Amino acid sequence: MEHFYRDTWVEVDLDAIEQNVTNALRLYKDREMNLMAVVKANGYGHGAVEVSQAALRAGASYLSVAFLDEALALRKAGIDAPILVMGLVGAEHVQLAIKHRITLTVYQLDWLEQAISRLHTRDKLAIHLKLDTGMGRIGLRRKEDIRSCMDFIASHECFELEGVFTHFATADEKDLTYFKKQCQRFNQWLEYIREWQLPIRYVHCGNSAAGLRFPEKNFNMFRFGIAMYGLTPSPEITDELPFPLKQAFSLKSRLSNVKKLPKGEGISYGATYVTEGAEWIGTLPIGYADGWIRHHSNAGGHVLIDGKRAPFVGRICMDQCMIRLPKKHSIGDTVTLIGESDGKQITMDEVAKRLNTINYEIPCVISWRVPRIYFRDGQIISVKNNLL
């Protein structure tokens, strides 16, 4: 087991990952459904390898990532499950994808033409065709472009059209007008694609929001991303979720210094905070280089220590920050920045709200200077320290 030597760390509850996957699949117990675990961005900052293993253990049958390097990292770690790269992979890398059994996303005729020149007669490249039904990001948008790609795929046996998919832009909102428009487009284009009579194994359109809110809108696969980590796709639909999500990510630190300062003393760079009386000030060994950005300095944020809230004071430094303690504490006492402490909780949603962002971003930006500790059944099963 790896070790780490700093007093700031992330705890990842793999039981939470597995519980969220299990509960999601139960929604589809009466019909065939494949759950694709989305582990891009290093598993949303949780750790792609460990999250993949937990998700597969709980019943996921497919993994997805953003780019080829992420897929290769999973293969290097010994993960054998099917992997879809959802972003663009250069056509020059198709042999690498075939060698490592990695499925690629296709949405350009030019790409298909470039790829075929690099494929051999007996090669089989698994692909998923991406349709842009309203996200405006990547994907085929016009019927004539779909026709051109389908004609090319159908006439070259090197391509195995394993799947067709799209992505919803507003499935996590109360207003479903645009969502329904995308559903309609996808159904129409899917019907058109079926005219080529190719054996398409997977059809997927649902993300976490659509997969949990609208099981009837999903085909035989949905992509389980943010909710797998126990985070709601958006606060406005929390009351519509079919089961409570269990947050897997906690961020903790230990006091590295404690001092009592008199009234009128400045704290941190610029002395932007001045003590209002005699105050106990604690220092934490975490800063913006760890992803705990400077905006925490003036956003009204707190930590938990012994279940009590303590506010940040002064500017966040590169490697350290300061808090105002409710009483005298000892160096080495544990402080919770995200997670639970003595029955109290600071959620990812709370942190995101004070930073005027979304919960997705928070774990993703906690840098890999911060080691990850993985728990199952309340016991540490592994430690990941990317610095050593």
Swiss-Prot record:
Q: Which CDD domains match?
A: PLPDE_III_AR
List, from the UniProt record, the residues annotated as the active site of this protein.
Answer: 40 (proton acceptor), 269 (proton acceptor)
Its annotated pathway?
A: Amino-acid biosynthesis; D-alanine biosynthesis; D-alanine from L-alanine: step 1/1
Cofactor(s) the protein needs: pyridoxal 5'-phosphate
N6-(pyridoxal phosphate)lysine: residues carrying this PTM: 40
For this protein, the record's Pfam families field holds: Ala_racemase_C, Ala_racemase_N
Q: Which GO terms describe its biological process?
A: D-alanine biosynthetic process; peptidoglycan biosynthetic process
Would the keyword Magnesium be found if you checked this record's keyword annotation? no
| Signal peptide feature range | none
Report the GO molecular function annotations.
Answer: alanine racemase activity; pyridoxal phosphate binding
Question: EC number(s) on record?
Answer: 5.1.1.1
Q: Which GO terms describe its cellular component?
A: cytosol
- Record-annotated residues binding substrate? 137, 318
What catalytic activity does the UniProt entry give for this protein? L-alanine = D-alanine
- Which keywords does the record carry? Isomerase, Pyridoxal phosphate
Q: What InterPro entries does this protein's entry cite?
A: Ala_racemase, Ala_racemase/Decarboxylase_C, Ala_racemase_C, Ala_racemase_N, Ala_racemase_pyridoxalP-BS, PLP-binding_barrel
Q: PANTHER family per the record?
A: ALANINE RACEMASE (PTHR30511), ALANINE RACEMASE, CATABOLIC-RELATED (PTHR30511:SF0)
Per the entry, what this protein does is: Catalyzes the interconversion of L-alanine and D-alanine. May also act on other amino acids.
Similarity remark: Belongs to the alanine racemase family.
The name of this protein is Alanine racemase
Organismal lineage: Bacteria, Bacillati, Bacillota, Bacilli, Bacillales
